[in-house]
Every structure is written in C-alpha cells, then in structure tokens.
Design a protein with these regions (language model features):
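Bacterial N-terminal signal peptides that target proteins for export
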Residues: 1-9
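Bacterial N-terminal signal peptides
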Residues: 8-18
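Short, low-complexity N-terminal intrinsically disordered segments enriched in polar/charged residues
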Residues: 19-48, 53-54
Length: 152
C-alpha cells in the first residue's frame, strides 16, 4: 500500500511540475480559446445569430464561400439536426501581432436527426483565421475537411 501511495504521489507531483514548466497562455491566446468555447456553446444550442456575430462581414474562404454562404450552411445543418454535440480539440493557436490569429483544431460532431439511423457523426479538421477588430475576434476565413482529408 505504501508503494502504491508513493508511486501515485510521485506521478501527481511530476504532472504538477510539468504543468508549472509550461509557458502561461498569452492574453490573445486565452481570448481565442474563449472565442472557441463561445462558438461551441452557440452551435450546440443552435444559436445561428450568435455564431454569425462571430463571423466578419468580409469573410471569404478558399471554397468561394462568403458570410451569407456560411450562414446558409449553418441554417441547413441546424434544421437537419435535432440535437448537436461537438467535441473540440485545439491543436494549435498562432498569434500575429496580437490582432490576428490562426486556430487549428479537430472537432468531433454528433447529432440526432429524423433520418433512418436517427443520428449522424463526423470528425472534421479546421484551420480558422481571425482578426481582432474593436476588441472582438472575428472569423475572416476558414479551411476545413473531414479528418484525414486535405483542408480546403
């Protein structure tokens, strides 16, 4: 029992030390993590207007989508799904001059619907580009693809 307790204590101590050695998140990085959390919450609650408030009016992506196209995609997805659950994993946050940033993340998506199986599930990888305008982060462009596929 003493060996188990000592081993457990050592593991906990090493984890605490390792966390203490990592750099603290910068203010812009913390803001972007909070931005992602707000977006996930809005999507799970199917709050399209709240989500669109996070997208810049000048949004454009490599697929040729503009802001209105993204709103249409959200509208269709929200209408098709009865419930939505998202499991995000932020892989990387890059900050440029504290007014621009890039987030690379993987999101597991599951939803219940009225289809034959009654549910759908996918995993996507996203590369999001953001700008900070008037103290608010706004999505200006995005690339995405199913997990394992090329981002476009």
């Amino acid at each position: 029992m003493k060996v188990l307790t000592r081993t457990l204590f050592t593991v906990v101590l090493l984890v605490c030390v390792a966390q203490g050695c990592s750099e603290p998140a910068s203010a812009p990085e913390e803001e972007l993590r909070a931005w992602v959390a707000r977006g996930i919450d809005a999507a799970e609650n199917k709050e399209r207007r709240k989500l669109m408030g996070m997208v810049a009016t000048a949004y454009v992506d490599a697929r040729g989508n503009e802001r209105d196209d993204i709103e249409g995609l959200l509208r269709v997805y929200f209408l098709r799904q009865n419930n939505i659950t998202l499991l995000p994993k932020i892989e990387e946050i890059t900050i440029y001059d504290e007014t621009a940033g890039k987030i690379v993340m993987t999101v597991g998506m599951a939803g219940t619907n009225d289809g034959v199986l009654g549910f759908s599930a996918d995993a996507y990888r996203f590369a999001l580009e953001l700008e900070k305008d008037a103290n608010e982060w706004q999505l200006i462009s995005a690339r995405w693809g199913e997990l394992g596929d090329e981002l476009r």
